[in-house]
A protein has these predicted regions:
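N-terminal amphipathic/basic leader segments beginning at the initiator methionine
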Residues: 2-39
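Glycine-rich phosphate/pyrophosphate-binding loop regions near the starts of catalytic domains
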Residues: 30-196
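Short, acidic (Asp/Glu-rich) active-site segment that either coordinates a divalent metal cofactor
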Residues: 175-225, 229
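Short secondary-structure boundary/capping elements
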Residues: 48, 88-95, 236-239, 284, ...
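Glycine-/charge-enriched secondary-structure boundary and capping motifs
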Residues: 2-16, 123-141, 154-163, 223-232, ...
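Residue-level signature of catalytic and energy-coupling elements of molecular machines
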Residues: 20, 70, 187, 259, ...
């Protein structure tokens, strides 16, 4: 039988888990159209449209302000189940700072919003530890935030410990050095930087597959994991700020910077203008991904839509600079690989040759 398109399969699985995709729903489109009405001209107008990892605001000076917001999603549920909250703050910083650097901006501050079921001292203190560690890794400050106690809205696996954690990060970038992907050309090289694991995406599917379908236990190891399942799932999202900023400061010809989150390598198309991407080599994904795939009966196509599959960030650069990009990432303590190259393609397709998958319009289809 022919395999279902991974986009359709992914949507079905998320609906089964209680999450419906919104990016093509009329309400989402209407919201975006309304927010565009706030865009003006002159000082303070956005330099990019919706859909990039971060937007950039012209404030009337040569330096512009990059801004992005994101949260940890249902990774918070795993933290609640384990009563372990000291790493989700790192995830919150990572999800925001990694987006801000995608436009070539250097992040310098983030504010947080913590919505809680109850203002538990231990919960808040442990979240704070993670935020501080994340700020250290990203070289930013956290000058403020908000705590909202809303038990009527926030519920949890452990009564009294429900929370949601969101951040908004800002950075600065010279308008002449803005990185948007518009300078990519055929022959440019795609360098992938290793992820630390599942990062902060796909947790609804992971919990459904691992805990509800396969009945695995968070406090036990499984498969080829070198730690308990819970510790693996809570590994903090890797922060790529220092190595990316070094590449920019040293003047490497960086054509595009891509945070690999939900939608996987399809995120490359977010920064493309008439460029397609051919992945000729892929690293072996960490064991957590095969564990999810086997437990949930998930296709390769769906896995590469939902998860980073071992590559948390991509740098598109000229062929002559690819070795230096790899070396800088490795000097920062991270693995990095040449994954593929760019081609001229008005459809902005992403081909994963080792998996015989073609990506376009939010899906990977086998060929």
């Amino acid at each position: 039988m022919a395999e279902k398109s991974s986009a359709a399969a992914s949507a079905e699985r998320y609906r089964e888990a209680g999450v419906a995709p919104v990016n093509e729903q009329p309400g989402f489109i209407s919201l975006i159209d309304q927010l565009r009405q706030t865009f003006g001209s002159g000082a303070r107008h956005p330099l990019l449209d919706f859909g990039h990892f971060a937007n950039v605001l012209d404030i009337g000076y040569q330096e512009a302000i990059a801004i992005s917001t994101d949260g940890v999603g249902t990774k918070a549920i795993v933290a609640q189940m384990l009563d372990k909250y000291d790493t989700v703050g790192i995830d919150c910083v990572a999800m925001n700072a990694n987006d801000v650097i995608c436009v070539g901006a250097e992040p310098f501050a983030m504010v947080d919003y913590i919505a809680v079921e109850a203002a538990d001292d231990h919960l808040l203190s442990e979240i704070g530890k993670g935020l501080v560690e994340g700020a250290r890794r990203a070289n930013i400050v956290i000058p403020g935030g908000e705590i909202s106690q809303i038990p009527q809205i926030i519920r949890s696996e452990r009564k009294g410990f429900g929370f949601d954690l969101v951040g908004t990060c800002i950075g600065t970038v010279d308008k002449d050095r803005l990185i948007t992907g518009d300078k990519m050309e055929a022959g440019d090289v795609i360098v992938g930087l290793a992820s630390s694991g599942i990062h902060s995406n796909g947790f609804t599917l992971a919990r459904t597959a691992l805990l509800e379908t396969a009945h695995l236990r968070l406090n036990e190891s499984a498969g080829e994991l070198d730690c308990t399942l819970g510790d693996e799932l809570l590994k903090p999202t890797r922060i790529y700020v220092r190595e990316i900023m070094q590449m920019i400061r040293e003047g490497l010809p960086i054509k595009a910077l891509v945070h690999i989150t939900s939608d996987g390598f399809l995120n490359l198309a977010r920064v493309s203008q008439g460029i397609g991407f051919v992945m000729e080599w892929l690293p072996e994904p960490p064991p957590i991904f095969s564990l999810i795939q086997e437990a949930g009966g998930v296709s390769d196509g769906e896995m590469f839509v939902v998860y980073n599959m071992g590559v948390g960030f991509c740098v598109v650069t000229s062929p002559e600079a690819a070795d230096r990009v790899q070396a800088m990432a490795q000097n920062a303590g991270n693995q990095a690989w040449r994954l593929g190259h760019c081609i001229e393609d008005a459809d902005k397709k992403v081909e994963l040759k080792p998996k015989r998958l073609m990506g376009q319009d939010g899906r990977f289809t086998p060929y």
